[in-house]
Amino acid sequence: TRIKLATILPIIVGSKRELTAIRRNFEKNISALLKEKLSISDPAREVGQTNFHLAYHGRNDRALQVKIAQLYERACPSLLYTAPHCRPSARIEKAGKVKIGFISRYLFSHSVALTARGLMAELTKEQFAKYVFCVPPVQKDQVSALIRQAVDHAVVLPGSLAAARERIAEARLDILVYLDIGMEPLTYFLAFARLAPVQCVFPGHPVTTGIRTMDYFISSEALESAGADAHYSERLVRLKFLPVYYHRPEIPDKRKALREFGLDEGRTIYLCPQALFKVHPDFDEVMAGILRADPRGEVVLVEVREKH
Protein backbone atom coordinates (compact mmCIF):
# COMPACT_ATOMS: atom_id res chain seq x y z
CA THR A 1 0.00 0.00 0.00
CA ARG A 2 0.96 3.66 -0.22
CA ILE A 3 1.21 3.83 3.56
CA LYS A 4 3.69 0.98 3.56
CA LEU A 5 5.87 2.71 0.97
CA ALA A 6 5.68 6.02 2.84
CA THR A 7 6.76 4.50 6.16
CA ILE A 8 9.72 2.41 5.01
CA LEU A 9 12.91 3.42 6.84
CA PRO A 10 16.53 2.47 6.08
CA ILE A 11 17.97 -0.06 8.49
CA ILE A 12 21.49 1.40 8.60
CA VAL A 13 22.04 5.17 8.52
CA GLY A 14 25.43 6.43 7.35
CA SER A 15 25.58 9.92 8.85
CA LYS A 16 23.69 12.53 10.86
CA ARG A 17 23.03 14.49 7.67
CA GLU A 18 21.52 11.41 6.05
CA LEU A 19 19.47 10.75 9.19
CA THR A 20 18.03 14.28 9.16
CA ALA A 21 17.10 13.97 5.48
CA ILE A 22 15.44 10.59 6.08
CA ARG A 23 13.30 11.95 8.90
CA ARG A 24 12.35 15.07 6.94
CA ASN A 25 11.23 12.96 3.98
CA PHE A 26 9.40 10.52 6.27
CA GLU A 27 7.43 13.33 7.90
CA LYS A 28 6.67 14.88 4.50
CA ASN A 29 5.24 11.57 3.26
CA ILE A 30 3.01 11.15 6.32
CA SER A 31 1.75 14.74 6.11
CA ALA A 32 0.85 14.25 2.44
CA LEU A 33 -1.10 11.06 3.18
CA LEU A 34 -2.99 12.76 6.02
CA LYS A 35 -4.49 15.12 3.44
CA GLU A 36 -5.95 12.23 1.46
CA LYS A 37 -8.95 10.01 2.16
CA LEU A 38 -7.26 6.65 2.52
CA SER A 39 -9.09 3.53 3.62
CA ILE A 40 -7.66 0.23 4.84
CA SER A 41 -9.50 -2.58 6.60
CA ASP A 42 -6.65 -4.48 8.28
CA PRO A 43 -3.39 -2.53 8.63
CA ALA A 44 -1.64 -5.44 10.37
CA ARG A 45 -2.06 -7.40 7.14
CA GLU A 46 -2.09 -4.67 4.50
CA VAL A 47 0.80 -2.59 5.89
CA GLY A 48 2.44 -5.27 8.02
CA GLN A 49 5.24 -3.13 9.44
CA THR A 50 5.92 -0.63 12.22
CA ASN A 51 8.13 2.43 12.63
CA PHE A 52 10.68 0.27 14.42
CA HIS A 53 13.86 2.04 13.28
CA LEU A 54 12.78 5.53 14.41
CA ALA A 55 13.76 4.59 17.96
CA TYR A 56 17.44 4.35 17.00
CA HIS A 57 17.71 7.83 15.51
CA GLY A 58 18.30 9.44 18.90
CA ARG A 59 15.70 12.18 18.33
CA ASN A 60 12.39 13.17 19.89
CA ASP A 61 9.91 10.95 18.04
CA ARG A 62 6.69 12.09 19.72
CA ALA A 63 5.39 14.35 16.93
CA LEU A 64 6.16 11.77 14.24
CA GLN A 65 4.64 8.88 16.17
CA VAL A 66 1.47 10.86 16.92
CA LYS A 67 1.13 11.85 13.27
CA ILE A 68 1.53 8.25 12.12
CA ALA A 69 -1.07 7.07 14.64
CA GLN A 70 -3.48 9.74 13.39
CA LEU A 71 -2.97 8.49 9.85
CA TYR A 72 -3.93 4.95 10.84
CA GLU A 73 -6.94 6.14 12.86
CA ARG A 74 -8.32 8.03 9.87
CA ALA A 75 -7.61 5.27 7.37
CA CYS A 76 -8.97 2.52 9.63
CA PRO A 77 -11.47 3.80 12.26
CA SER A 78 -12.17 0.23 13.41
CA LEU A 79 -8.74 0.27 15.09
CA LEU A 80 -10.40 2.28 17.88
CA TYR A 81 -12.45 -0.71 19.03
CA THR A 82 -13.58 -0.56 22.66
CA ALA A 83 -14.09 -3.78 24.63
CA PRO A 84 -17.61 -4.11 26.10
CA HIS A 85 -16.39 -3.92 29.71
CA CYS A 86 -14.56 -0.65 28.96
CA ARG A 87 -17.58 1.18 27.55
CA PRO A 88 -19.28 3.90 29.64
CA SER A 89 -22.43 1.77 29.91
CA ALA A 90 -20.55 -1.23 31.33
CA ARG A 91 -21.48 -2.39 34.81
CA ILE A 92 -18.69 -2.05 37.35
CA GLU A 93 -17.81 -5.48 38.70
CA LYS A 94 -17.42 -6.18 42.39
CA ALA A 95 -13.97 -6.02 43.89
CA GLY A 96 -11.76 -9.08 43.57
CA LYS A 97 -8.40 -9.94 42.12
CA VAL A 98 -6.91 -7.42 39.72
CA LYS A 99 -6.92 -8.93 36.24
CA ILE A 100 -3.64 -8.03 34.59
CA GLY A 101 -2.52 -9.13 31.14
CA PHE A 102 0.87 -9.06 29.44
CA ILE A 103 1.13 -9.20 25.67
CA SER A 104 4.10 -9.80 23.37
CA ARG A 105 5.36 -11.74 20.38
CA TYR A 106 8.61 -12.39 22.27
CA LEU A 107 7.64 -14.56 25.23
CA PHE A 108 10.54 -16.98 24.86
CA SER A 109 14.33 -16.74 25.28
CA HIS A 110 14.43 -13.15 24.07
CA SER A 111 15.48 -9.93 25.80
CA VAL A 112 11.83 -8.85 26.16
CA ALA A 113 10.84 -12.01 28.03
CA LEU A 114 14.06 -12.18 30.03
CA THR A 115 13.43 -8.70 31.46
CA ALA A 116 9.72 -9.26 32.12
CA ARG A 117 9.53 -12.88 33.27
CA GLY A 118 10.48 -12.07 36.86
CA LEU A 119 7.90 -9.27 37.05
CA MET A 120 5.15 -11.66 36.01
CA ALA A 121 6.29 -14.27 38.51
CA GLU A 122 6.60 -11.88 41.46
CA LEU A 123 3.07 -10.49 41.21
CA THR A 124 1.21 -12.48 43.85
CA LYS A 125 -1.66 -14.70 42.79
CA GLU A 126 -3.51 -13.63 45.94
CA GLN A 127 -3.82 -10.10 44.51
CA PHE A 128 -3.63 -10.65 40.77
CA ALA A 129 -5.21 -12.89 38.17
CA LYS A 130 -2.37 -13.03 35.65
CA TYR A 131 -2.76 -13.50 31.89
CA VAL A 132 -0.22 -13.67 29.09
CA PHE A 133 -1.27 -13.19 25.49
CA CYS A 134 1.18 -14.78 23.06
CA VAL A 135 1.30 -13.31 19.57
CA PRO A 136 1.85 -15.96 16.88
CA PRO A 137 3.98 -17.57 15.66
CA VAL A 138 4.65 -18.89 19.15
CA GLN A 139 8.13 -20.17 20.02
CA LYS A 140 8.41 -22.63 22.88
CA ASP A 141 11.48 -23.09 25.05
CA GLN A 142 12.47 -23.14 28.72
CA VAL A 143 11.68 -19.44 29.21
CA SER A 144 8.23 -19.69 27.63
CA ALA A 145 7.48 -22.69 29.85
CA LEU A 146 8.50 -20.75 32.98
CA ILE A 147 6.27 -17.84 31.97
CA ARG A 148 3.30 -20.17 31.54
CA GLN A 149 3.93 -21.60 35.00
CA ALA A 150 4.03 -18.11 36.53
CA VAL A 151 0.60 -17.00 35.29
CA ASP A 152 -2.97 -18.18 35.64
CA HIS A 153 -3.92 -18.05 31.97
CA ALA A 154 -1.71 -18.34 28.88
CA VAL A 155 -3.56 -17.48 25.68
CA VAL A 156 -2.26 -17.88 22.13
CA LEU A 157 -3.88 -15.13 20.09
CA PRO A 158 -5.28 -15.66 16.60
CA GLY A 159 -3.30 -14.02 13.83
CA SER A 160 -6.22 -11.84 12.75
CA LEU A 161 -6.31 -8.34 14.27
CA ALA A 162 -10.09 -8.36 14.80
CA ALA A 163 -10.11 -11.87 16.28
CA ALA A 164 -7.17 -11.05 18.57
CA ARG A 165 -8.99 -7.98 19.88
CA GLU A 166 -12.06 -10.05 20.68
CA ARG A 167 -9.99 -12.72 22.40
CA ILE A 168 -8.32 -10.21 24.71
CA ALA A 169 -11.64 -8.46 25.39
CA GLU A 170 -13.11 -11.76 26.61
CA ALA A 171 -10.70 -11.69 29.57
CA ARG A 172 -12.27 -8.44 30.87
CA LEU A 173 -8.89 -7.18 32.06
CA ASP A 174 -8.33 -4.35 34.52
CA ILE A 175 -4.81 -3.66 33.27
CA LEU A 176 -3.17 -4.55 29.96
CA VAL A 177 0.62 -4.32 29.71
CA TYR A 178 2.25 -4.17 26.30
CA LEU A 179 5.87 -5.22 26.69
CA ASP A 180 7.26 -3.94 23.38
CA ILE A 181 4.96 -1.86 21.16
CA GLY A 182 6.60 -1.18 17.81
CA MET A 183 8.59 -4.37 17.41
CA GLU A 184 6.00 -6.16 15.30
CA PRO A 185 2.73 -5.20 13.59
CA LEU A 186 -0.01 -7.05 15.49
CA THR A 187 0.70 -5.60 18.94
CA TYR A 188 1.22 -2.13 17.46
CA PHE A 189 -2.22 -2.13 15.86
CA LEU A 190 -3.88 -3.86 18.83
CA ALA A 191 -2.69 -0.94 20.97
CA PHE A 192 -5.16 1.41 19.25
CA ALA A 193 -8.06 -0.47 20.85
CA ARG A 194 -9.32 0.07 24.39
CA LEU A 195 -9.05 -3.46 25.78
CA ALA A 196 -8.62 -2.57 29.47
CA PRO A 197 -9.45 0.47 31.62
CA VAL A 198 -5.71 0.94 32.18
CA GLN A 199 -3.26 0.33 29.33
CA CYS A 200 0.47 0.80 29.60
CA VAL A 201 3.63 0.04 27.69
CA PHE A 202 6.99 -1.15 29.00
CA PRO A 203 10.29 -0.09 27.40
CA GLY A 204 10.87 -3.35 25.53
CA HIS A 205 11.01 -0.97 22.57
CA PRO A 206 12.02 2.32 24.20
CA VAL A 207 10.06 4.95 22.27
CA THR A 208 6.67 6.58 22.65
CA THR A 209 3.83 4.92 20.73
CA GLY A 210 2.01 8.13 19.77
CA ILE A 211 -1.22 6.18 20.30
CA ARG A 212 -3.86 8.04 22.33
CA THR A 213 -5.37 4.91 23.89
CA MET A 214 -2.04 4.12 25.57
CA ASP A 215 -2.22 5.62 29.06
CA TYR A 216 1.21 5.15 30.64
CA PHE A 217 4.81 4.59 29.56
CA ILE A 218 6.61 2.73 32.37
CA SER A 219 10.24 3.80 32.67
CA SER A 220 12.79 4.68 35.34
CA GLU A 221 14.41 7.76 36.86
CA ALA A 222 17.71 6.26 35.75
CA LEU A 223 16.64 6.26 32.09
CA GLU A 224 14.90 9.62 31.69
CA SER A 225 16.14 13.21 31.61
CA ALA A 226 14.37 16.07 33.40
CA GLY A 227 12.46 17.12 30.27
CA ALA A 228 11.69 13.63 29.01
CA ASP A 229 7.92 14.02 29.43
CA ALA A 230 7.92 16.01 26.19
CA HIS A 231 9.11 12.89 24.35
CA TYR A 232 6.02 10.84 25.24
CA SER A 233 2.37 10.99 24.22
CA GLU A 234 1.67 8.71 27.19
CA ARG A 235 1.96 9.79 30.82
CA LEU A 236 5.57 8.99 31.70
CA VAL A 237 6.02 6.98 34.90
CA ARG A 238 9.53 7.22 36.35
CA LEU A 239 10.08 4.35 38.75
CA LYS A 240 12.89 4.60 41.29
CA PHE A 241 14.22 1.32 39.91
CA LEU A 242 14.48 -0.25 36.48
CA PRO A 243 11.22 -1.83 35.27
CA VAL A 244 12.89 -5.21 34.83
CA TYR A 245 13.45 -8.31 36.93
CA TYR A 246 16.36 -10.38 35.68
CA HIS A 247 17.05 -13.85 36.95
CA ARG A 248 20.76 -14.48 37.40
CA PRO A 249 21.99 -16.52 34.41
CA GLU A 250 23.97 -19.71 34.85
CA ILE A 251 27.62 -19.18 33.95
CA PRO A 252 29.28 -22.18 32.28
CA ASP A 253 32.26 -23.67 34.10
CA LYS A 254 34.39 -23.74 30.99
CA ARG A 255 34.99 -20.44 29.27
CA LYS A 256 36.32 -20.06 25.76
CA ALA A 257 39.59 -18.31 25.01
CA LEU A 258 39.70 -15.29 22.70
CA ARG A 259 41.45 -17.32 20.01
CA GLU A 260 38.41 -19.61 19.82
CA PHE A 261 36.46 -16.59 18.59
CA GLY A 262 39.13 -15.73 16.05
CA LEU A 263 40.46 -12.85 18.17
CA ASP A 264 44.10 -11.96 18.82
CA GLU A 265 44.89 -12.33 22.54
CA GLY A 266 47.67 -9.77 22.16
CA ARG A 267 45.22 -7.02 21.31
CA THR A 268 42.93 -4.95 23.53
CA ILE A 269 39.39 -6.00 22.69
CA TYR A 270 36.62 -3.40 22.80
CA LEU A 271 33.34 -5.29 22.54
CA CYS A 272 30.16 -3.56 21.41
CA PRO A 273 27.57 -6.36 21.74
CA GLN A 274 24.78 -4.63 19.83
CA ALA A 275 23.15 -5.16 16.46
CA LEU A 276 24.50 -2.76 13.85
CA PHE A 277 21.12 -1.13 13.23
CA LYS A 278 21.23 0.13 16.84
CA VAL A 279 24.56 1.90 16.35
CA HIS A 280 23.98 5.65 15.87
CA PRO A 281 26.16 7.50 13.32
CA ASP A 282 27.61 9.56 16.21
CA PHE A 283 29.12 6.37 17.61
CA ASP A 284 31.27 5.86 14.51
CA GLU A 285 33.58 8.65 15.67
CA VAL A 286 33.66 7.20 19.19
CA MET A 287 34.95 3.89 17.84
CA ALA A 288 37.42 5.65 15.55
CA GLY A 289 38.69 7.70 18.50
CA ILE A 290 39.28 4.57 20.57
CA LEU A 291 41.30 2.98 17.79
CA ARG A 292 43.34 6.14 17.25
CA ALA A 293 44.14 6.30 20.97
CA ASP A 294 44.98 2.59 21.24
CA PRO A 295 47.04 1.25 18.30
CA ARG A 296 46.63 -2.29 19.66
CA GLY A 297 42.89 -1.90 20.06
CA GLU A 298 40.33 -3.90 18.14
CA VAL A 299 36.60 -3.08 18.12
CA VAL A 300 34.36 -6.15 17.91
CA LEU A 301 30.77 -5.80 16.72
CA VAL A 302 28.10 -8.48 16.56
CA GLU A 303 26.86 -9.94 13.29
CA VAL A 304 23.10 -10.42 13.47
CA ARG A 305 21.18 -13.25 11.83
CA GLU A 306 19.40 -10.96 9.37
CA LYS A 307 21.37 -9.84 6.34
CA HIS A 308 20.84 -6.27 5.15
What are these regions (language model features)?
Residues 99-101, 271, 300:
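Short, well-ordered beta-strand segments
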Residues 117, 284-288:
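Short acidic-capped amphipathic helix/loop micro-motif used as an active-site/signal-coupling element
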Residues 271-282:
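Substrate-binding clefts and catalytic carboxylate motifs of secreted carbohydrate-active enzymes
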Residues 112-113, 280-284:
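Nucleotide-sugar-dependent glycosyltransferases with a strong bias toward membrane-associated enzymes
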Residues 1-265, 275, 306:
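Alpha-helical solenoid repeat scaffolds of the TPR/TPR-like class and their adjacent stem/linker regions
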